[in-house]
Amino acid sequence: AKKIVIEIGNEKKIINIPIVSIENKTYLDKTMLEGSIATASKIKSGNPYCLFFVVCETYEVSKETDPVYSDIDEIYCLRKSTDSKRSAPINSDLILELFNKVKNHLNSTWSDVEGKIESGKIIG
């Protein structure tokens, strides 16, 4: 989180703005996914630059439910499994990918409108 000092009247307050948020779950079912989607939306309403990840061992949500259009940036299913009874190994490549995404985000320039104007594409 990034600490921000705000002043309201004569009073100064320090607030924390999330830069990266990671929810960790042993398994992810539909109810937990819905809660994570709501949390991601709340966090991103305060800081749209925040990355929001869910990390779970197994993904136990029906295949008809697709969270791709939610505010969650990625769901990492470390065992690449939909069944918590199977003991597939945790995939270390996924952990490294998550680490690198967080590291790159923390070191990135969040806003470069002038550079985007030069490219001709303002949003992406």
What feature does the model see in each segment?
Residues A1, A38-A40, A88:
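A sequence-composition feature that detects small, non-aromatic residues
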Residues A1, I17-T26, S36:
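Conserved catalytic cores of phosphodiester-cleaving nucleases, focusing on short active-site segments
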Residues A1-G9:
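Short acidic loop-to-beta-strand element that houses the catalytic metal-binding Asp/Glu
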Residues I6, Y27-A38, S45:
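Active-site-adjacent loop/helix micro-motif of nuclease/hydrolase catalytic cores
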Residues G9-N10, S41:
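Generic recognition of flexible, low-complexity loop/linker segments
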Residues A38-K42, Y69-D71:
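Short, solvent-exposed amphipathic alpha-helical segments in soluble enzyme
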Residues P48-G124:
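C-terminal tail/extension regions appended to the core domain(s) of diverse proteins
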